[in-house]
Swiss-Prot record:
Domain of life: Eukaryota
Polar residues composition bias: residue spans: 473-489
Residues modified as Phosphoserine: 329, 363, 387, 512
Organism encoding this protein: Homo sapiens (Human)
Tissue expression per record: Widely expressed.
Keywords, in A-Z order: Coiled coil, Phosphoprotein, Repeat
Gene Ontology MF terms: identical protein binding
Descriptive protein name: Liprin-beta-2
Free-text comment on this protein's domains from its UniProt entry: The N-terminal coiled coil regions mediate homodimerization preferentially and heterodimerization type beta/beta. The C-terminal, non-coiled coil regions mediate heterodimerization type beta/alpha.
Gene3D superfamilies on file: Transcription Factor, Ets-1 (1.10.150.50)
SMART domains: SAM
Stored Pfam families: SAM_1, SAM_2
C-alpha cells in the first residue's frame, strides 16, 4: 500500500513539475521574451489535468492515515520537486492570503506545521533504514542457501554421471537380452508352427471320428427304418392275407347265396327285386374289397421299393465304413438280436406283455397268433422313429374301418364264422360259461380291442402301472359292454363305515377296562406308549367307565386327569400341578388366552406358552397337521442333520416340536440364542425343505448314493453329513470337518441365492491365496447345483442391492419407532407373525421326488428383505 502511494505521489509530482515548467514558459512568453513566431502557451495549456492531479494527490494522502507511512512517502520525494512544490504552494497561499482577508494563518504556524511534517519524514526514513538492514540480512541468508544448493547441484551432477555410466551398461545388457529374446521368438515360432500342424492333424482326426459317428448314427437310423419297413411289410402281408381270407369268405357267401337263390327261385318269385338288391349290395361290397386289395398290393410294392432303396444305401454305407461291415452283416442276419441289444437300456411296459403273453394266448378258440418278440420290441421303440404318428393313424384307421390287422386262423367251418357275417369286427369272441369264468378271465393280448390301440395306449402309460391295472384296462376295452365295471383296488374302496357300522366298529369286548391287551401284545415299544410308561398310568383303574366314555369325546369334554396326561405326553409335565388346580375340563384350555396360561398355569417360558397355544388352536380348528406327529426329540436330531447341533440344548429346553417349526419367528430364534444370519437362513431353508416334502421325517439323506447322477432335487435333501461326504469325494477331505456346526446343508446350498462357492470356501477356511483350490471348489460347486440355480445366483450377485453372505453377520431385533409404542401392550413376544419360513397355501403340492423347480416354486427365499437381515432382524 505504501509503495503504491509513493508511486502515485511521484507521478503526481512529476506531472506538477511539468505543469510548473509549462507555467514558467508561459510567464516568460507573456513577458515578451518568446519569439514572435511562436504561439502563446495559453492556447494549448489546459488547467484541468493539474487540478485532477492535485485532487488525486489529496486522496492518496488521505488514504495514508499513519504518520510513519506519510514520513516514508515524503522521504522518497526528490528534493527539488518538493522545494518547487513548496514554493509554488507558498506563492499561491501568499496570493490567497493577499486576496482573502478571512485567512488568519501566519507564517509561524505554517513553519511549525512543516517542522512536524519534517519530523514525521525523518521518522519514516529511520523506519525505512531498519527495513533495508533487515532486507540485507535476508539477502545474506539467501546467499548462504544458494551456496548450499550449489554444492548439492554439484553432487547431483556427479550422481548423474554415474547414472549415465550405469545406464550405458544396462543398455548393453538390454541389447544382449534382445538378441536372446529374438532367438527365443524364432524358437517359439517354430514350436507354434509344429503345434499348428499337430492341431491340424488332430482336427482332421476329430473330423474323421465325427464323420464315423455320423455314419454310425445314420446306420442305426437306417437299421431302425429297415426294421420299421419290415414290420410294415409283415403287417401289410398279414392284412393282405386277412383281406384274401375275407374275399374267400365273401366268395363262399356269394356261392351260398347263389345256391339259395337257385333253390328258392320258384318258391319266392315275388321277392325277385329284393334278391337283386341284395346281390347288388354284395357286388358293391366285393368291389370295395377288391379295391382295398389293390390298394394293399400297391402299398406292398411301395414298401418293396423302399426296402430296395434301403438296401442300396446300406451297401453304400458298408463301402464307406469298413469296420462296421461285420456289424451290419450280423444285424442283417439276426435283426431281432441286434435290435434288442440296441434297445437294452430302453424298457417299456410291453415287456410285461411279453412275460404274460404265452398263457393268455393259449386259448384255442381265439384266432390271432401271439405277436413275435421282434414285433413287440419294434412297437415299443416306435417312439424313436419319425413315422410314429403315421403308424398310429394307420392302425386306428384300420380298426375304425373294421379290418383286423392280424390274420384270423380259425377254420372255415367254425360256428363263430357261421353265426357272424363280419368275423373281422370285434365282438363276442367266446361264450360266457355258467360260472362266469369267461367274464373274469383276462383276454388275450394279441386280440385287438374296440379302438384298435391297446398297445399304443399301453406305450403311452407310465411304467409304474402293475399287471392288474393293465389287464383291467385291456379287458374293459376289448370286451365292450359285455364285462362289468371292474375297478381296481382304490382308496375309495376302503371307506369308513357309516351309521351303525361305525358305532359297532369302535366297540371292543375285552377283559380290561383300561387298554386293549390284544393290540398291546402285537405293538412294538415306542415312546409315549403304554408299555413305555407302565408306572402311574396303568395304575389308574378306578374310573374305567369314565375313561371308556372319554375315549372318543371331543377335547372340550376331556376330564382334568386326561388333560394332565395329555400335558405329560406333550412334554409340559412341569405344569401339571397347576393344571390340576385350574383346569376343570378341556374347555378351559380351549377358551384360555396366553395371559391366562401365564397367570393360572405359571407358564413363564414364552415358547412353552406358544407350544400350548398352537396345540390348542389345532385342536380347536379340528385340523391334524403333519408337523405335530413328531416331538421335540426329533427336532434335536433334525438340528444334527442340518449342521446346527450347538442349539440342541436351547431347542430341547424350549420343547420345540415340528408344529412349532412352522410358526418359528425371528424373535423366537433370537430367544433361542440363534443370532447368526447364516444360521437363520439355514433353519429357514431346512424348514422349507420339510414343507415341500410334507414333513417327511426321513426326507434328508445322510449317506451317499449314486454320485454319477446327481440332480438339484436330490442335492436339496442333503444333510450336513452328506455335504461333508461330497467334499471328501471332490478331494477336499481335509476341509470337510470345518463344516461341523456351520449349518450348511443341501437346502441352503440350492435355495439360498446368496450362498455361492466363495461362501462355502470361506466356511471351509480355505485361504484366499489358494486360488487354484478355490477355483476347483467353485467348479465342483457349480456342477453340483445345476445351471438353473447357478444362473439365479449370478443374477442375485449382479443386482445393485446385493450384499455378500458372511459368517459374521448378526441378526438384530427390530427397532420400534415412536409410532409403534402404542402396539407394545397389544402384541407380546409370542404373538409376532414375522415367521422365519411362512407357510404357503400350496405346501402339499410338491412331493419328495419333485424336481428342483418345485422347490423353487414354493420357495419364500426370494424376498428382497433378505439383504437387510442384519439391520431389521427379520427374514421374510
Amino acid at each position: 500500500m505504501a509503495s503504491d502511494a509513493s508511486h502515485a505521489l511521484e507521478a503526481a509530482l512529476e506531472q506538477m513539475d511539468g505543469i510548473i515548467a509549462g507555467t514558467k514558459t508561459g510567464a516568460d512568453l507573456s513577458d515578451g521574451t518568446c519569439e514572435p513566431g511562436l504561439a502563446s502557451p495559453a492556447s494549448y495549456m489546459n488547467p484541468f489535468p493539474v487540478l485532477h492531479l492535485i485532487e488525486d494527490l489529496r486522496l492518496a494522502l488521505e488514504m495514508l492515515e499513519l504518520p510513519q507511512e506519510r514520513a516514508a512517502l515524503l522521504s522518497q520525494i526528490p528534493g527539488p520537486t518538493a522545494a518547487y512544490i513548496k514554493e509554488w504552494f507558498e506563492e499561491s497561499l501568499s496570493q490567497v492570503n493577499h486576496h482573502s482577508a478571512a485567512s488568519n494563518e501566519t507564517y509561524q504556524e505554517r513553519l511549525a506545521r512543516l517542522e512536524g511534517d519534517k519530523e514525521s519524514l525523518i521518522l519514516q526514513v529511520s523506519v525505512l533504514t531498519d527495513q533495508v538492514e533487515a532486507q540485507g540480512e535476508k539477502i545474506r541468508d539467501l546467499e548462504v542457501c544458494l551456496e548450499g544448493h550449489q554444492v548439492k547441484l554439484n553432487a547431483a551432477e556427479e550422481m548423474l554421471q554415474q547414472e549415465l555410466l550405469s545406464r550405458t551398461s544396462l543398455e548393453t545388457q538390454k541389447l544382449d537380452l534382445m538378441t536372446e529374446v529374438s532367438e527365443l521368438k524364432l524358437k517359439l515360432v517354430g514350436m507354434e508352427k509344429e503345434q499348428r500342424e499337430q492341431e491340424e492333424k488332430q482336427r482332421k482326426a476329430e473330423e474323421l471320428l465325427q464323420e464315423l459317428r455320423h455314419l454310425k448314427i445314420k446306420v442305426e437310423e437306417l437299421e431302425n427304418e429297415r426294421n420299421q419297413y419290415e414290420w410294415k411289410l409283415k403287417a401289410t402281408k398279414a392284412e393282405v392275407a386277412q383281406l384274401q381270407e375275407q374275399v374267400a369268405l365273401k366268395d363262399a357267401e356269394i356261392e351260398r347265396l347263389h345256391s339259395q337263390l337257385s333253390r328258392t327261385a320258384a318258391l319266392h318269385s315275388e321277392s325277385h327285386t329284393e334278391r337283386d338288391q341284395e346281390i347288388q349290395r354284395l357286388k358293391m361290397g366285393m368291389e370295395t374289397l377288391l379295391l382295398a386289395n389293390e390298394d394293399k398290393d400297391r402299398r406292398i410294392e411301395e414298401l418293396t421299393g423302399l426296402l430296395n432303396q434301403y438296401r442300396k444305401v446300406k451297401e453304400i454305407v458298408m463301402v464307406t465304413q469298413g469296420p462296421s461291415e461285420r456289424t451290419l452283416s450280423i444285424n442283417e442276419e439276426e435283426p431281432e438280436g441286434g435290435f434288442s441289444k440296441w434297445n437294452a437300456t430302453n424298457k417299456d411296459p410291453e415287456e410285461l406283455f411279453k412275460q404274460e403273453m404265452p398263457p393268455r394266448c393259449s386259448s384255442p378258440t381265439v384266432g390271432p397268433p401271439p405277436l413275435p418278440q421282434k414285433s413287440l420290441e419294434t412297437r415299443a421303440q416306435k417312439k424313436l422313429s419319425c413315422s410314429l404318428e403315421d403308424l398310429r393313424s394307420e392302425s386306428v384307421d384300420k380298426c375304425m374301418d373294421g379290418n383286423q390287422p392280424f390274420p384270423v386262423l380259425e377254420p372255415k367251418d367254425s360256428p363263430f364264422l357261421a353265426e357272424h357275417k363280419y368275423p373281422t369286427l370285434p365282438g363276442k369272441l367266446s361264450g360266457a360259461t355258467p360260472n362266469g369264468e369267461a367274464a373274469k378271465s383276462p383276454p388275450t393280448i394279441c386280440q385287438p380291442d374296440a379302438t384298435g390301440s391297446s398297445l399304443l395306449r399301453l406305450r403311452d402309460t407310465e411304467s409304474g402301472w402293475d399287471d392288474t391295472a393293465v389287464v383291467n384296462d385291456l379287458s374293459s376295452t376289448s370286451s365292450g359292454t359285455e364285462s362289468g365295471p371292474q375297478s381296481p383296488l382304490t382308496p375309495d374302496g376302503k371307506r369308513n363305515p357309516k351309521g351303525i357300522k361305525k358305532f359297532w366298529g369302535k366297540i371292543r369286548r375285552t377283559q380290561s377296562g383300561n387298554f386293549y391287551t390284544d393290540t398291546l401284545g402285537m405293538a412294538e415299544f415306542r415312546r409315549g406308549g403304554l408299555r413305555a410308561t407302565a408306572g402311574p398310568r396303568l395304575s389308574r383303574t378306578r374310573d374305567s367307565k369314565g375313561q371308556k366314555s372319554d375315549a372318543n369325546a371331543p377335547f372340550a369334554q376331556w376330564s382334568t386327569e386326561r388333560v394332565c396326561a395329555w400335558l405329560e405326553d406333550f412334554g409340559l409335565a412341569q405344569y401339571v400341578i397347576f393344571a390340576r388346580q385350574w383346569v376343570s375340563s378341556g374347555h378351559t384350555l380351549l377358551t384360555a388366552t396366553p395371559q391366562d396360561m401365564e397367570k393360572e398355569l405359571g407358564i413363564k417360558h414364552p415358547l412353552h406358552r406358544k407350544k400350548l397355544v398352537l396345540a390348542v388352536k389345532a385342536i380347536n380348528t379340528k385340523q391334524e397337521e403333519k408337523s405335530a406327529l413328531l416331538d421335540h426329540i426329533w427336532v434335536t436330531r433334525w438340528l444334527d442333520d442340518i449342521g446346527l447341533p450347538q442349539y440342541k440344548d436351547q431347542f430341547h429346553e424350549s420343547r420345540v416340536d415340528r408344529r412349532m417349526l412352522q410358526y418359528l419367528t425371528v424373535n423366537d430364534l433370537l430367544f433361542l440364542k440363534v443370532t447368526s444370519q447364516l444360521h437363520h437362513l439355514s433353519i429357514k431353508c431346512a424348514i422349507h425343505v420339510l414343507h415341500v416334502n410334507k414333513f417327511n421325517p426321513h426326507c434328508l439323506h445322510r449317506r451317499p448314493a449314486d454320485e454319477s447322477n446327481l440332480s438339484p432335487s436330490e442335492v436339496v435333501q442333503w444333510s450336513n453329513h452328506r455335504v461333508m461326504e461330497w467334499l471328501r469325494s471332490v478331494d477336499l477331505a481335509e476341509y470337510a470337518p470345518n463344516l461341523r456346526g456351520s449349518g450348511v446343508h443341501g437346502g441352503l446350498i440350492i435355495l439360498e441365492p446368496r450362498f455361492t462357492g466363495d461362501t462355502l470356501a470361506m466356511l471351509l477356511n480355505i485361504p484366499p491365496q489358494k486360488t487354484l483350490l478355490r477355483r476347483h471348489l467353485t467348479t465342483k460347486f457349480n456342477a453340483l447345483i445345476g445351471p438353473e440355480a447357478e444362473q439365479e445366483k449370478r443374477e442375485k450377485m449382479a443386482s445393485p442391492a446385493y450384499t455378500p453372505l458372511t459368517t459374521t453377520a448378526k441378526v438384530r431385533p427390530r427397532k420400534l419407532g415412536f409410532s409403534h409404542f402404542g402396539n407394545i401392550r397389544k402384541k407380546k413376544f409370542d404373538e409376532s407373525t414375522d415367521y422365519i419360513c411362512p407357510m404357503e397355501p400350496s405346501d402339499g403340492v410338491s412331493d419328495s421326488h419333485r424336481v428342483y423347480s418345485g422347490y423353487r416354486g414354493l420357495s419364500p427365499l426370494d424376498a428382497p428383505e433378505l439383504d437387510g437381515l442384519d439391520q431389521v432382524g427379520q427374514i421374510s
